[in-house]
Amino acid sequence: MLYLEYIVLAALVVFLSVRLSYYVDCLDKKTNLSGAFIGGVMLAAVTSLPELFTSLTAVLALDQPDLVQGNVLGSNIFNLCVIGGLMLFTSRRYQRATLSKSHSKTLWFGLFMYALVFAAIMMPKEVGFSFLKVNLMSILILLVYAVNVKFMGNDDSGDVEEEVYISLSVRRIAVRFICYSVGLVIVSILLTTVTDRLAEELQLGATVAGAIFLGVATSLPELSASVNLVRIGNFNASFGNIVGSNLFNFIILCFADVLFTQGSIYVNEPQVMNLLGFGAFSMVCTLVVIYGKKHRALVLLASVAILGSYVTSILLSM
């Protein structure tokens, strides 16, 4: 019964995220907002809602900070696997696609955030008041994210003008977008409690359970949305969704750090270090996918490396 609950909730996450990706594509075509901003900030934030609310539930209701690290870091590697997997099947179409320049900048910011999380674990430095203390690196992560959002908001280098008729008004699109977002939040909270029960039943560590069950399940929105966007030819928003979600996931650690008052959210464990190392490696490989866009063999090689990185990280974390 527990596994059935997990599957049903995961399926609901997929359905809701596919609908969200459709309305994001509608906004992309009906407004003057840059495609990089819509995919990398709006859609990224919405498809990261499961990571956000599952992590907050893990901290506030379940007292499981290890679930948060496994969820966020595991989700980040899985997200990049989506790009790797898509490239294996759509590399020829990808070579003809137009991408915003900000995507590579976002990945560089992401690598910097990995370094900040590593520093938070190895050299913990808390700032704040007696009743509210946060790791200094959490503040720096928020600042880095804010700078990246500014870059994305001004980047329209990947936008392509196309005449597409959409019958819905911007207002109706926005209302439906919000409704599906709320549904995604509710399902995400339920998914966290089921994952915690699965971890107990299978006697898995919280970090491993977070990386496998939460990391994969909460990445289903990114997977579904990105596959759907590539299917309709919007590679730019698809890439923005993945790399933007990865950056947004890092600030989830910051929120959890503020709310968890019984210790540090940044825990030094071998499983966490594995996820950090392979996550950073996957980001480097994704940069190769972007910079080597015209060289199909290089794109395919980097994509295989991303997929191999995820499998290896999970095996070493068991």
Predicted feature residues:
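Hydrophobic alpha-helical segments, chiefly the membrane-spanning helices
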Residues: 1-318
